[in-house]
């Protein structure tokens, strides 16, 4: 065992923790609550994700027979992946959640008109986790207001920086 193996492991674990982010979800939805879910993956999918070939931008989750599935997430297979398994890069993937979390999500989706969107995919204790959010869709004027607020915050920062230089 090398002298710095513990430090190297800690640095590499924190540096490569996030696999994929869904920035579009923050723009398109009002995010109410977040949940951590496991993913039921095949071996080639884990290998592809390790190589950085996971994408959750167009993904969403839906309820089917009391279970929650992720659809639209793209995991591109590696060229040297196994040939005896047919690799479908956009297949349905089951989300692994506690029953109480599933019941809460199902109730909100069916009664209150919420949707379930993935916001991040990351490593946690050598397992791939998906952060899903309970969200409501934004209307066009909400998106414009958010953009206006963001632009104003940037402009305020510029003015403050200029003011600090003059003083």
Curated annotation (Swiss-Prot):
<dbReference type="InterPro" id="IPR020081">
    <property type="entry name" value="SsrA-bd_prot_CS"/>
</dbReference>
<dbReference type="GO" id="GO:0070929">
    <property type="term" value="P:trans-translation"/>
</dbReference>
<keyword id="KW-0694">RNA-binding</keyword>
<dbReference type="InterPro" id="IPR000037">
    <property type="entry name" value="SsrA-bd_prot"/>
</dbReference>
<dbReference type="Pfam" id="PF01668">
    <property type="entry name" value="SmpB"/>
</dbReference>
<comment type="similarity">
    <text>Belongs to the SmpB family.</text>
</comment>
<dbReference type="GO" id="GO:0005829">
    <property type="term" value="C:cytosol"/>
</dbReference>
<dbReference type="InterPro" id="IPR023620">
    <property type="entry name" value="SmpB"/>
</dbReference>
<protein>
    <recommendedName>
        <fullName>SsrA-binding protein</fullName>
    </recommendedName>
</protein>
<keyword id="KW-0963">Cytoplasm</keyword>
<comment type="function">
    <text>Required for rescue of stalled ribosomes mediated by trans-translation. Binds to transfer-messenger RNA (tmRNA), required for stable association of tmRNA with ribosomes. tmRNA and SmpB together mimic tRNA shape, replacing the anticodon stem-loop with SmpB. tmRNA is encoded by the ssrA gene; the 2 termini fold to resemble tRNA(Ala) and it encodes a 'tag peptide', a short internal open reading frame. During trans-translation Ala-aminoacylated tmRNA acts like a tRNA, entering the A-site of stalled ribosomes, displacing the stalled mRNA.</text>
</comment>
<dbReference type="GO" id="GO:0003723">
    <property type="term" value="F:RNA binding"/>
</dbReference>
